[in-house]
Amino acid sequence: MEKKRYNVLFIQVDQWGEKFLNFTGNDKIMTPTINQLARDGVTYSNCYSTCPVCIPARRSLMTGLFPKAHGDRVYSDRMKMPSVTTLAEAFHQAGYHTMAVGKLHVYPQRNRIGFQDVILQEEGRYEFGGPDDYQIWLGENGYIGQEFLHGMGNNTYYTRTWPLGENAHPTTWATGQMVKQIKRRDPEKPAFFYLSYTFPHPPLVPLSEYWNMYSDQDIQEPEYGDWEDESFIFKELMEAARYYSHKEMIRAKKAYYAQCTHIDHQIRLVIGALKEEGILDDTILVFTSDHGEMLFDHGMVGKRTFYENSAHIPLIFSGKPIVDIRGKIDDRIACLEDIMPTLLDLCNIQVPDTVEGRSLFEKERRDFLYGEISEGYRATRMIRMENYKLIYYPYGNKIQIFDILQDKNELHDLSDKDEFKNVKEEMLIRL
């Protein structure tokens, strides 16, 4: 008897850390749709980006390879994908109709990496071979050259509300395009839908409707630990955030939350399209991010660090096909590289031999996870074990250890504490 081939809706967001979701304990942010996905599926509460930088993280996701194997731990925007079977190719070879909407962040920009249909939206990066499909749509609908009319940058934390029509907002546009893809799928084949939003990554330009949800609300102050000193590496990591006033920091956090809530509401529309088409009950839903966002905690912004805000990401598998594990929270150490083999296992597709990640439905758990970012004076390495995390900066030989179980916000560095000497030695061996 032929095994069931489920449809997949894979929702990828950009720069959305595990900390910024309501169901993980953040009562200041509204994410009702994602909360429901978590209730209806399994959540991996210790999932990490092994290289929390846009391109390397997405290469790991799409190949199941760790950065050392796929070749990028920096941000190599002219590096081609490795010659291995990608996640999309594996589904295509198994007879799926593979469709992508949004950000792929590959080179060359129009490389389909195994998707049969691609509607591209790449944050206005013309240097990679634009225009993309979103920019073409803007030109055809009276918005030519207005993508950045708001004046906010892709890596800055000033904010203003979206100045164009709601239908032209990148989040709303991507949702509409995915709904169209769902309706035009091949009805004779199972479908792999990949929806890759470019937000909440800056620019911070929420729709007024969502900005107004947070503008008058109290919100968390930036958090600082007992370890931010005058070390060279900390000065480097904190450089980008030091130009913002306290008022600008709070506004940035509210705008970021607004962009998250906008995405959450749009996801509901995509799920609604699956239901209208009569395929929701046969569809596995996946939600994750490439990496997180420091958002002024520890005096930092962006990613490229192994602190929880940046490296700890959400991962949910949901939907009726996995109803047997509904509401489960799995605390094993997981990573982006595990998503490909897990999804292929769920859909009864053979996992390529090249994949280094492991299926999260196996009983065996890894003892530790290794992560690496960058080279030169900003090089950073990480070891994550059951309770503890070690962060190592080779330049300056700086070591930090955090008890993630007791100190999730990493306020207390334990690396110089005598009672953690054995923990430190064990983790350094792993490094």
Positions of predicted regions on the chain:
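Residues forming the ATP-binding cleft of Hanks-type serine/threonine protein kinase domains
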Residues: 405
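Formylglycine-dependent sulfatase
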Residues: 1-393, 398-399, 408-429
